[in-house]
Amino acid sequence: MGKYNLTALRVRQTALRQKEAGKTHQIPKWIDVVRDIPPAQVLVRNQQQQHQLVRQRLKTLPGASKPQVVFEVQEKRVKPKKASRMFLPTEIKYEEDLLRKEFFRDHPWELARPRVVLESTGKDYENYDWSRLQQPGKRLDGESVVQRQLWLLNNVPDMTKSTAYDIARREFYRLRLQEDIERRVAAEEAEATGATFGPTRLEIGMELENQEYERWKVWAKSEAQVQEQRAAAFTGAPEIPSTEDSLGLEEGVEEKQPQQA
């Protein structure tokens, strides 16, 4: 068919004919799958549909006695794409992505905390009630702040993004402080009953830093000596005066001293 190559569409027919002709002794296992789900016959590739970001808000409308749920559509700016990127899959975006980016930009060290990503059924989120920040069976982390902020935006009337962020962040700080106090009290009680603890993470880090600094000092001294030797090789060693020259200089100095007197 001219410039179109339909060999890939006829791959099942080709495999069956090769089996009938005796070129192959076994039918491929994907024969039935290709029969049930044949390749697409459309030769024109359509451009991917650009989806809009829809946000749910609870607002008090003029003339209404109660707040009503309003769905806001955020218009996406259409950017011209190159021909090579025209048919790439559409990027999936959620409202939580912007909230998550803002929180971890302000609290980068929260990413260094260990996290448990294992789920039992994959539907653990159904058991969470984000009307409060702390959830049973889930450790407090940055994702808790993001979900709490999103709940405030969706369920509190006339809630703004900055106000919801401040409320969730204030609750997060209070719970973090409570965890630190509980950890310190538990350590003090254990030490009072005779428990001994090893060095803290800060002390271990300082010790590793000191060891690395000592290794660097040894390396720096050796590098400095090598550079000095290379410089001496280019310039040559300084000349050492002979014994006769040194004696002549000393006699000249002794002769000049009486004249000055």
Swiss-Prot record:
The gene is rsm25. InterPro entries: Ribosomal_mS23_fun. Signal peptide: none annotated. Keywords: Mitochondrion, Ribonucleoprotein, Ribosomal protein. It comes from Aspergillus oryzae (strain ATCC 42149 / RIB 40) (Yellow koji mold). GO terms for molecular function: structural constituent of ribosome. One of its GO terms (cellular component) is mitochondrial small ribosomal subunit. The keyword Ribonucleoprotein applies. The keyword Ribosomal protein applies. It holds the Pfam family MRP-S25. It is found in: Mitochondrion. PANTHER family: 37S RIBOSOMAL PROTEIN S25, MITOCHONDRIAL, SMALL RIBOSOMAL SUBUNIT PROTEIN MS23. Belongs to the mitochondrion-specific ribosomal protein mS23 family. Residues 228-261 are annotated as: Disordered. This is Small ribosomal subunit protein mS23. Component of the mitochondrial small ribosomal subunit.
